[in-house]
Amino acid sequence: MANFDGQTAVITGGAQGIGFATAKRLINDGCDVMIWDIDEKLGLETSKKLNCQFLKVDQTDNKAVQEATDKTIKQMDKIDILVCSAGIAGPTYTTWDYPVEEWSKVFNVNVNGVFYCNKYVVKTMRDKGYGRIINIASIAGKEGNPNASAYSASKAAVIGLTKSLGKETASQDIAVNCITPATAKTRILDQVSQEFIDYMISKIPRNRFVTVEEIASLIAFLASKENSFTTAGVFDISGGRATY
């Protein structure tokens, strides 16, 4: 178990799902956590439950993310760790039937939002000479899921962003990595059909969902000082589904 005493973390989408489990894990390991989430009601409930701080942030708004970064620095003095967990699945359509507005919505949240968070937070890390960034991608970003081209392509973009930023910051003690989990049982599944859920489980040799706690354990290592060498990496947690 890593020791995060004296460290601070920002977790986007921290009010639920993977973000919530990660916030809980890091707090239990001694970290001071600030949750960024668009759901104010749930975010405030989570902050009380976990005894952490909360900011309502729409990560698709470039200016809002910049302001949230400034507010967080004022409140917490620094940001040692950034976990980008906020994301959406989007609807399930074939690529030729995919509504353009829905495609844009998925990319705005999953790609632009992650870019904004990485962009502004990493600047503060470069000033301090230390940081850990973990972006939540997906096995879909490596393999591509049928009827989920927007989600799959957006998560592939997160992998590419992670690799680029990791190389750009490698000369400092800043590690930028992403993880590619299989499906976890979170509210994001409310956005897709049961047929699609059954398909995803059928592709996992473990024959079950990954738990959010299992994902949080991997994130905790990547967020720790023990992860002192690996950067620009893609860490699989797909229960055997990944082919590379």
Regions found by a protein language model. Name each.
Residues 89-92, 143, 231-244:
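Short C-terminal tail/terminal secondary-structure segment
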Residues 93-95, 99-104, 189, 200:
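Substrate-binding pocket helix/loop in short-chain dehydrogenase/reductase
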Residues 96, 143-149, 171-172, 207, ...:
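Active-site loop immediately N-terminal to the catalytic Tyr-X3-Lys motif
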Residues 118, 154, 162:
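Active-site helix of classical SDR
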Residues 123, 167-171, 228:
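Alpha-helical segment proximal to the catalytic Tyr-Lys
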Residues 138:
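Residue(s) in the substrate-gating loop at a strand-loop-helix junction
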Residues 204-215, 226:
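A conserved structural motif in NAD(P)-dependent oxidoreductases
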